[in-house]
A protein has these predicted regions:
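Membrane-cytosol interface segments of multi-pass membrane proteins
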Residues: 1-169, 173, 321-390
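Interfacial loop-to-helix transition and helix-capping segments at the boundaries
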Residues: 13, 43-55, 122-135, 176-202, ...
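Membrane-interface helix termini and inter-helical loops of multi-pass transporters
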Residues: 38-45, 108-117, 179-188, 216-219, ...
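Specific transmembrane alpha-helix
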Residues: 55-68, 137-147, 173-219, 263-284, ...
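Membrane-interface junctions at the ends of membrane-embedded or membrane-associated helices
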Residues: 69-78, 148-157, 211-224, 275-292, ...
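C-terminal TM-helix exit segments that contain a strictly Trp-centered aromatic cap at the helix terminus
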Residues: 95-107, 170-177, 236-245, 310-315
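Alpha-helical transmembrane segments of multi-pass integral membrane proteins
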Residues: 128, 237, 245-362
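Signature aromatic-anchored transmembrane alpha helix within multi-pass, membrane-resident enzymes
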Residues: 165, 224-238, 291
């Protein structure tokens, strides 16, 4: 299980630090909108379908970082898996237990508790965001094959992306329409969230981006307006298709704003590229507020793991205060502004505090997937072009 001795790791990708911060913020936003009692309205659905791109962006970023770090050098795979699984499997098990307790399963008889725990560990069902850790573990397991595919098709990555796009669009249509061809395929279509092939294009796209990172960085810096314009068109198209499905085709808001929408495939890649553009532009400008961004990026996994617990606590407090019932009576525009502009940042900020503090304790690995940090993250102010790919 080895391909020689691993070489020195590649330089840190500072642009990805900002991507992580933005993506986690988008995740917190979509979960705040969808888990606070907001009226089932067209406006809420339109916001949700755009924010759902955060899921796919995570897998693009994961594959990009892996391919950049391990794509062109010898890797001892047993060491790779040991390090990666330690940082994912441990917090996965810990947070599964945390959310079981938070949901009241501590009252269950021991046998029922253990049965639920076993099922949640297998499926990621303890809380709605834990599927990402299961899929991440599948990516790590399959990364030797993913790397081989990217390397073997190095001169044909356009075709590889094209085939991946056709597959992803077809799969998204099947999931959205709940096709039932039979057997394991039906089980997959009806339960796609925690299965790696459900995100194949995003892993391929991230891997290709990591392989061609310098070229993509240079192109992005030279075509920033094009990327932003294409993303704006993509967002408008996403909302337009949502409105068509909701108002003309009679789909429910939940169905029309689902994460496995064919149009979300395009929207996710466009927003991912916009986040990358923001990252490389930030590095080019010398990384202003870099200590804040790097600290939030360093704690982003912990924020991701903890934010549903924060959201549960906030809604529990808001109920007796009458805020939740008021949200069902107030104009939806006002509610969405408060949810996105006030509540989501609060969830993010409150989730960040324990994540930042735990990074300096022995609990860091279990709670945030990172070894204990003894000093604050710091970054030099490198030359702009050199630092973009760092």
């Amino acid at each position: 299980m080895t391909e020689g001795v691993a070489a020195a790791p590649r330089r840190h990708l500072h642009a990805v630090d900002l991507m992580r911060v933005l993506t986690v913020a988008l995740v917190v936003g979509v979960h705040t909108v969808t888990h606070v009692p907001v009226k089932d309205t067209v406006a809420a659905g339109a916001l949700t379908v755009v924010f759902h791109s955060s899921r796919e962006i995570f897998f693009v970023v994961t594959a990009l970082v892996l391919m950049h770090g391990y794509g062109r050098r010898a890797v001892r795979w047993t060491d790779f898996w040991r390090r990666r699984y330690l940082c994912v499997a441990v917090p996965y098990a810990v947070w599964t237990l945390v959310y079981m307790l938070a949901d009241g399963h501590w009252r269950d008889p021991l046998g029922a508790f253990l049965h639920t725990l076993g099922g949640d560990l297998l499926t990621g069902g303890a809380k709605y965001q834990l599927y990402f850790l299961l899929v991440s573990m599948q990516i790590y397991l399959c990364f030797p094959a993913i790397r081989w595919l990217i390397r073997a098709t190095r001169n044909h990555h356009g075709w590889l992306l094209g085939v991946g796009a056709v597959f992803q669009l077809a799969l998204s249509a099947a999931i959205h329409q709940q096709w039932s061809p039979g057997g394991l395929v039906t089980a997959w279509v009806h339960g796609p969230d925690a299965v790696l092939p459900s995100y194949l294009l995003y892993v391929i796209a991230g891997g290709v981006a990591g392989w061609h990172l310098d070229r993509i960085t240079a192109w992005t810096l030279a075509h920033r307006r094009l990327v932003l314009g294409a993303t704006a068109v993509s967002v408008v198209a996403t909302v337009g298709i949502f409105l068509l499905q909701r108002l003309a085709l009679g789909e429910t808001t939940v169905d029309a704003s689902g994460v496995f929408q064919p149009v979300v495939v395009v929207d996710s890649l466009a927003i991912a590229w916009t986040f990358f553009t923001a990252g490389v532009s930030w590095v080019e400008r010398g990384m202003p507020l870099r200590r804040v961004v790097l600290a939030l990026s360093d704690s982003s996994f912990g924020i991701y793991l903890a934010h549903p617990l924060v959201l549960m606590g906030m809604t529990t407090i808001a109920g007796p205060l009458g805020l939740l019932s008021a949200s069902t009576r107030a104009p939806i525009a006002v509610v969405l502004v408060i949810v996105v502009g006030v509540m989501a940042p609060l969830v993010y900020g409150i989730g960040a505090l324990p994540a930042l503090l735990l990074r300096r304790t022995p609990l860091s690995l279990a709670m945030s997937g990172r070894p204990q940090r003894r000093t604050s993250p710091a970054a030099p102010a490198p030359a702009a072009r050199e630092a973009v790919a760092a």
